[in-house]
């Protein structure tokens, strides 16, 4: 605005100068015309003319020619000056227009920058809101997953607890059955030995009975021969004893037969119990195997379901890709052509759309599974296009940055000019303050001069009054009074004028102070606004520089990714499948697993196809199941049987290891402590000493009791029990004393 006002003033001054020159020339031409118009013409001879008149006419003609020459020269000078001024005005108008255009461009640039800043801020806000919403959704999903995880963990813990409880019950039952089987086996051995011994006795008794029968028959025969024998008392006694012996033997045989029958019944019961124990053992092992494989089977089933879903999704993706690959390429090319044919005025919209396309493309590339070189090529093309868009954006940002730098330089120049004006204004204020101080000093000096003059006047008046009282008369006295009054009036007027001047000085000082305060406030406001504008421009510059750096980094990353993709493409093109050989085990676990999965997948696909065919047939009268279902179930059963076999094998190995370790533990305890431990049912422990293995101690941990058959062998058993167990509560010391006593007894023997 200041430039416009200065130019207008300059043009008005130039127009005034031209109008003045025009008026002078017009007046001069009018005077010349009037001089020529009056009387006869100078070129015609008057009829009654004289030579004087001719000479005067020649002089006048010369003067006229000189004046015409001057007029022509003035007109030429005027036209030259006019042309120069027109050139200057044209140059100034061009400069003025250029400055106005630059100002308008700067204003448009600033408006564009502010608008772009607002748009970017809005985009930032929207992105922040989107990110916040996405984060909230992710947090909600994470919380839901955590809750489900916790629920699953709780279910797993409950199932584990149930499984552990069942396992403990089953193991307890197994141990109980084992102990019963061992006890029944020992009883069987004892009964078998008894039966063998009794059978041998029965055979001996049968032989004796046979011999006695022979003797009886011989006796009867002799009795029949000797119908009237004479028995002696000795023979009679022998016969009676023999009869008693026979009766005793018969009773004994009957008792043995009854005992044999009872033992046979008991043996049958024991066999039945053994059969039941073996059956329960088998059932227990089956249950344990099923329980151990249940979690594994569940996890395998879930994994297979997930794999099936993934494979189905991959199949659908491949089908979609095969169908819509050409359409996507055509759409991408059309979008590129449309983006290239747009005008420069729609740059912001292009940037927004390109940013949205970049985001969508990035999301698409993240979601895609890169398992194919075609997908890699497609991603490479997309990244190449994104790189071109980013380079265009980078160029635009560089231009904006350069414009901002120019604006910043102009603002800095204006700021320096304002600072110079501010310094000049402050210097003027300082000078005015100095003048004010000098005026105040002059005022104080004038007041002191007035005071001194009054004192001198008072002294003069007193001296005059004294002289007048002594010398002069009343008339002279009256005249002196008039003089004194005149002097007093002059002093009062001087005093009033000085007071008026002081008041005016005060007013001027107040005005100056108020003006200085107003100017300072305006200056501060201007300074604040200018500083704020400068800060805003500097902040915006810094932000744009940071954005430029981030964009350049992204560009470098994109270029590196492009290079890597190009290298991968070159490698893929150079590779030949025949030359690739992967060394693997023929019968490795991974290959087995892959083979099983492949077979299972084939069976499931076949089953799915058969079931779909059955559904398409729609025969409600006939209910049939395809053979593929049976094949898949049979395959699963075989897999389960293999896993059960493996788990049984592992369980038997672990059992063997446990038995070996338990025997080692018992041997170590026996060798170190001198006691052999035997764990029984109901938390009982049977302790055998190495110095007397036929004697033992039974410790009941539930009832906290101790029973033994060593009280007869060790003297003062009750005293030792009272001393070490009841009074001191030291069972190891009690056992140590028992070992010492037994060792002493052994050494004594």
From Swiss-Prot:
| Record Gene3D superfamilies | 3.30.457.60
The lineage, from the top, is: Eukaryota, Fungi, Dikarya, Ascomycota, Saccharomycotina
User: Which residue positions does Phosphothreonine occur at?
Assistant: 502
Mod. after translation: Becomes hyperphosphorylated when wild-type cells are arrested in mitosis. Phosphorylated by MPS1.
The chain's coiled-coil residues are: 57-324, 390-656
- Which gene is this protein's source? MAD1
Alphabetical GO CC annotations of the entry are: kinetochore; mitotic spindle; nuclear envelope; nucleus
* Family statement drawn from the similarity comment of this UniProt entry: Belongs to the MAD1 family.
Q: Where in the cell is it found?
A: Nucleus
Biased composition, Low complexity: where in the chain? Answer: 331-370
Job of this protein: Central component of the spindle assembly checkpoint. Thought to recruit MAD2 to unattached kinetochores. During checkpoint activity, MAD2 is relayed from the MAD1-MAD2 complex to the mitotic checkpoint complex (MCC). The formation of a MAD1-BUB1-BUB3 complex seems to be required for the spindle checkpoint mechanism.
What is the annotated signal peptide range for this record?
none
Q: How does it assemble?
A: Forms a stable heteromer with MAD2 throughout the cell cycle. Part of complex consisting of MAD1, BUB1 and BUB3 after activation of spindle checkpoint.
Name assigned to this protein: Spindle assembly checkpoint component MAD1
